[in-house]
């Protein structure tokens, strides 16, 4: 499945850490999920999933509660999901997933970010066909074969199960992510460090130090945009 997940997580953690910007983005995602259904995670599975992910990212409880309270209070903002695809230097590819209350603002900002940082924004589908939408579940463990058997018995469509640095990493079909989580919980595994839908590059490129500096500036600028929730790329040495 490409780069080791442990390496991806280590670089991401070193890059953004538990910052207020991460909290704010989760706040928006929680609010949007609560507005689309009931503001109660026990009756709104989408909201429950976002809250679980927020806790994995160490988002404080007061941030989660504030977003839910805002939805309960009848906040009138409507958020729309989007995806923008583009290219960086020397065969590098980028996908930016957004959640915004102002689509025109987001389109303009993302396009400007690409152009100012050595990239070019592409049409829908220009890049995403080179990535696989994949469910990723990570938790402590050292026996991938046993975990594979658990998931197989539960008829979860699994792409791969690996052991990386004391962690089990499960890759599922995107439609079976929640089924996989449920099967693991039923088997007594309840603590997860990651439960995400991710776009994983089918192949990767390595950039020269000069190109890497340009590309890193592009990724940083996209991640700094308040409307951008996730950024995926195919650069192995970032």
Curated annotation (Swiss-Prot):
SUPFAM superfamilies: YebC-like. It is found in: Cytoplasm. Pfam families: TACO1_YebC_N, Transcrip_reg. One of its GO terms (cellular component) is cytosol. InterPro entries: Integrase-like_N, TACO1_YebC-like_2nd/3rd_dom, TACO1_YebC_N, Transcrip_reg_TACO1-like, Transcrip_reg_TACO1-like_dom3, Transcrip_reg_TACO1_YeeN, YebC-like. Keywords: Cytoplasm, DNA-binding, Transcription, Transcription regulation. GO terms for molecular function: DNA binding. It comes from the Bacteria. GO terms for biological process: regulation of DNA-templated transcription. Gene3D superfamilies: 1.10.10.200, 3.30.70.980. Belongs to the TACO1 family. YeeN subfamily. This is Probable transcriptional regulatory protein LACR_0237. It comes from Lactococcus lactis subsp. cremoris (strain SK11).
């Amino acid at each position: 499945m490409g780069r080791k997940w442990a390496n991806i997580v280590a670089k991401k953690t070193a890059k953004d850490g538990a910052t207020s910007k991460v909290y704010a983005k989760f706040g928006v995602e929680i609010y949007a999920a609560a507005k689309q259904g009931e503001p109660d995670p026990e009756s709104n599975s989408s909201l429950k999933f976002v809250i679980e992910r927020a806790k994995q990212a160490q988002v404080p409880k007061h941030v989660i509660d504030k977003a839910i309270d805002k939805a309960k209070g009848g906040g009138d903002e409507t958020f729309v999901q989007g995806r923008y695809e583009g290219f960086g230097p020397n065969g590098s590819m980028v996908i930016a997933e957004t959640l915004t209350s102002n689509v025109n603002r987001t389109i303009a900002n993302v396009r400007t970010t690409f152009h100012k940082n050595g990239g070019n924004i592409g049409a829908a589908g220009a890049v995403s066909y080179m990535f696989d939408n994949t469910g990723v579940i990570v938790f402590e463990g050292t026996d991938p074969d046993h975990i594979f058997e658990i998931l197989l018995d539960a008829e979860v469509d699994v792409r791969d199960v690996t052991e990386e640095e004391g962690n089990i990493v499960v890759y599922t079909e995107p439609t079976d992510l929640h089924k996989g989580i449920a099967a693991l919980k039923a088997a007594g595994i309840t603590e997860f460090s990651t439960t995400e839908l991710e776009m994983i590059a089918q192949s990767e490129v390595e950039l020269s130090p000069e190109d890497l500096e340009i590309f890193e500036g592009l990724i940083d600028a996209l991640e700094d945009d308040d409307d951008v929730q996730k950024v995926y790329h195919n650069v192995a040495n970032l």
